[in-house]
Amino acid sequence: VSQTSLLDCGVTWRGIGLPEANAALEAWSHKMGGMHRPCAADVAAHGLLHDGRLVAVACTAGLIRETVAGAPWLNRGNAVELARLCADRTSLCRVALRLWRVFTFPTFGRAYAVSYQDADLHSGNTYRFDGWQRVSFARAGGEDRRSGRKARNKWVWVWPPQNTKQSP
């Protein structure tokens, strides 16, 4: 009788190059596209692979602004941003988020992780079911200065969850 170990299922979580992550984000039609921030040295990409094929991506970056919209206690000194989370099938986003939170986020040495989520496109369940807390709402106005696209309303999620919306 042959038995397959869970360790033999061909699944790997590891750092990947930004070009590989960007190619996947584009191929999977992520609404924000690839990670093209001015300070590329401040970006890290990780991937979930199955039998050597990339099936999910998580990109981490430093905060663009000094503080997080609606949560000024979150800043460049104490937080990193999970800037992209995408998979070739949606059910793998939860898996990638959990792997990122448990294994990748602690390597950045910051107290908090934040993620901005499009309020019109997403229900928030991916973050909520992983234990994240929604801490603020960023209302968009006009155009995104970086992309020229119409700005979008965003929910701001934080890990670890806080008791209040104010500074812990």
Model regions and ranges:
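Short amphipathic alpha-helix that is part of the acyltransferase structural core
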Residues: 1-40
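Acyl-donor binding region in acyl/amide transferases
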Residues: 15, 61-153
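A short helix-loop-beta-strand connector motif used in the catalytic cores of GNAT acetyltransferases and
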Residues: 35-53
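Short hydrophobic/aromatic beta-strand or adjacent loop that forms the aromatic wall/cage
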Residues: 43, 152-156
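Conserved beta-strand in the GNAT
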Residues: 47, 52-69
